[in-house]
Amino acid sequence: MTFSIVALDQETKTVGVATATGNINVGSRVPHVKEGIGAIATQGLTEISYGIKGLKLLEMGYTPQEALEKLLKSDPWREHRQVIIIDIQGRKAAFTGKENFNFKGHIIGECYIVAGNLLASKEVIIEMAKAFENGKEEFEEKLLLALEAGKKAGGDIRGEKSAALVTASKIKKRLNLKVDNHKDPIKKLKQLLHKQKNKS
């Protein structure tokens, strides 16, 4: 259904989310970022308020794990949710509800989390993690590399229709790139990123 990465660039304190799905309009639902605070991807049976409320909880001083537990506690549909959170300190939390469609899962790395559901196989998130860890490019490019690797490994079993790349930083220009209802949204997202960088 959706595969995503949330990450922190420890040097610039930039947070970001890259995401792709076989549905439309992923950019307005899944990724949530705030400079100096953190990044959240909320997917599965997407509850947009998890992103909005989650960032507010982080801003109030909750750790990602505490924020996640608070969000899930009163949610009767929690087992249908998939949520990954990283804060500006690099602390992380992840939840993949058992009612998400297979393959479902997440991997927590040093300064990132990858997650997905309704994927071709576990290799999707494994390859995403490898691509991000081994990337030598700038932070935004590494987020995109993770998406490309996920797609190459099989991605969403339905194929991808929309993708987004969102970052926030106090010292770098914010990125908010979205591609919707496209036959190859990740490729188009890469084109948009390069176009944006050429403007800078």
Please report, for each region that a protein language model flagged, where it lies by residue.
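N-terminal nucleophile
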Residues: 1-200
